[in-house]
A protein has these predicted regions:
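Eukaryotic intrinsically disordered, low-complexity regulatory linkers and tails enriched in Ser/Thr/Pro
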Residues: 1-65
Length: 65
């Protein structure tokens, strides 16, 4: 399963994990220490992606095609 993130900058990322799991990672980072990033895996490239939880505008389950 993948989840789409849209940041306040307009950047879009498709990351591994269902929406609830990705939401939990983002919330945990937001509640963590100052400037803690949410570490995710970009679905297409398998690269690590660090996201500032304060910059997430939209999180939604990606459609499977």
């Amino acid at each position: 399963m993948t989840t789409e993130l849209i940041l306040v900058t307009g950047d879009r990322y498709c990351v591994e994990g269902d929406a609830k799991a990705v939401e939990r990672i983002i919330l945990d980072a937001a509640r963590g220490s100052i400037m803690q990033l949410a570490w995710l895996v970009e679905a297409e490239t398998q690269e690590q992606l660090a996201v500032n939880p304060e910059h997430v505008a939209v999180l939604r389950a990606a459609s499977s095609q």
